Structure formats: C-alpha cells, structure tokens
Amino acid sequence: MLRRSPTLLRVSPFSLYMKDLAKNGTLQNDRNPAKTASRLYRKLSEPEKMALQKRAARVSYPALDAYNRFQKEYAHRFLHLSNKKRQREVSKLWAELKKNGTVKVPKAPKAAKSASSKVKTAAKTAKKTTAARK
C-alpha cells in the first residue's frame, strides 16, 4: 500500500530536470519530449541525480501550500460528504473566495525551535535568577 509522505508530495527531480531541458531548448520541436527527457535522465550520473534530488527537496509552491492550509482548515465543514465531493466543495469555496478577494488562508505553523536553543535560553534564565539572588 502506498503511504502519503511529505517527500512524495514535493516536486520530483525528474520534473525539475524536464524544466531545465525546456529552458535549454533541448525539448523544442520534439514529438515526445517526455520520452526524450526520460532517456536523458537515465543517462545522468549519480552525483547529478543527487544534486537534482537536493534541489527538488528545497522547491515548494507557495500557492499550493496556501491552498493545502485552506483545505485543511475548511474540510471539516463538509464531513457529511464523501472525500471526492468534499474536495470539490472546498475547491469551489476556494475559487469563490479567491474571486471575491476574501480568501483567509491560515498562516503556516512556525518552525519549532531546536533543543539546543531551548537549553541555552533555560541556562540564561537560570544564570539571571541566581545572579539576582546574590
């Protein structure tokens, strides 16, 4: 069974490679650009593929992220519908609100602080309290 993971939902290295080929003009006037791109992609060396994977991991689509947050926020309103119909209703709502200019997208959650920064702040407050006691 396929599982859903953030890695699978991101941009694929192959799609980035196809974009690069399209920018270079390699795929211009080609009857089957996907076939040509896949043949060239398979010929890439391992370091080149790893570089593409690293680039793909960094790429995100802000508009898609905003829609996903909106969908997460509003999907619970349509729990009485099947999943497919729920997705349609949320997308209709998104389109309608976007057309009116009244889309309220929830903000992205802030990145959690690292454990080391928490330890440092705790140590600083401990120093301050001990210094204040003296």
UniProtKB/Swiss-Prot annotation:
**Stretch list, region Disordered:** 106-134
Q: What induces it?
A: Expression varies periodically during the cell cycle in the same manner as transcripts of several kinetoplast and nuclear DNA replication genes.
Record's keyword terms, sorted:
DNA-binding, Kinetoplast, Mitochondrion
Report biased composition (Low complexity) as residue ranges: 106-124
- Listed GO MF terms: DNA binding
User: Does the keyword Acyltransferase belong to this entry?
Assistant: no
Q: Which residue intervals are annotated with compositional bias (Basic residues) in the record?
A: 125-134
Would the keyword NAD be found if you checked this record's keyword annotation?
no
Q: Which domain of life is it from?
A: Eukaryota
Q: Where in the cell is it found?
A: Mitochondrion matrix, Kinetoplast
Q: Which residues belong to the propeptide?
A: 1-10
Q: Which GO terms describe its cellular component?
A: kinetoplast
Per UniProt, subunit arrangement is: Associates with the kinetoplast DNA network.
Q: Which family does it belong to?
A: Belongs to the KAP family.
Protein function: Histone H1-like DNA-binding protein involved in the organization and segregation of kinetoplast DNA (kDNA). The mitochondrial DNA of kinetoplastid protozoa consists of about 5,000 minicircles and 20 to 30 maxicircles. These circular DNAs are held together by catenation into a highly organized compact disk structure referred to as a kinetoplast DNA (kDNA) network. Binds preferentially to a specific fragment of minicircle DNA and is able to compact kDNA networks through DNA charge neutralization and condensation.
Q: What is this protein called?
A: kinetoplast-associated protein 3
> Which organism is this protein's natural source?
Crithidia fasciculata
The major lineage groups are:
Eukaryota, Discoba, Euglenozoa, Kinetoplastea, Metakinetoplastina
Tell me what gene encodes this.
KAP3
